[in-house]
């Protein structure tokens, strides 16, 4: 009889431990998923990058992280209308043979341009360290132009397109924008999800 009681008590203990572990997993799962968020990037958010430019529309703050980890950006839906003629593109952008004399944001990032343009209107991003974002006067526009004292340096711009996962080594903010330079006639935008540490 005593042996039967011990076996029953052991089973009850195991059941309680198993139930507790299941509850912990259920509570932890939504916490992890909570780091993913939806972001809309308007079709005119060029960050004042490129040459010539017509509007200083800042990049969109998409995700702020407090330390190292992996950030994932995934295109969900949307198109950008690039001009008054109604030309549209998806997140990978389009090529432009008639854009000679224009430097797009990704060209500026590489220190090139003024020739054939690829990825025009594409979804692009930049990760800015927290130390720069917190400086007085910071805005998510081109920091090499006279528009402000503290901005984003173009060398950090990168193509996201339909999606990108990348690692960051420090606290900071991911900003998203559009690879275009004349944006006054742009409309539409991209819906994306962003997840991070």
Spans of features found by a protein language model:
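Generic detector of short alpha-helix boundary/capping microenvironments
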Residues: 21-24, 164
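Gly-Asp-aromatic-enriched flexible segments
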Residues: 36-197
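Serine/threonine-rich low-complexity intrinsically disordered regions
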Residues: 8-10, 29, 67
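Bacterial N-terminal signal peptides that target proteins for export
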Residues: 3-20
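C-terminal segment of classical bacterial N-terminal signal peptides
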Residues: 24-33
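Short, Lys/Arg-enriched N-terminal segments with co-localized hydrophobic residues
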Residues: 2-4, 33-35
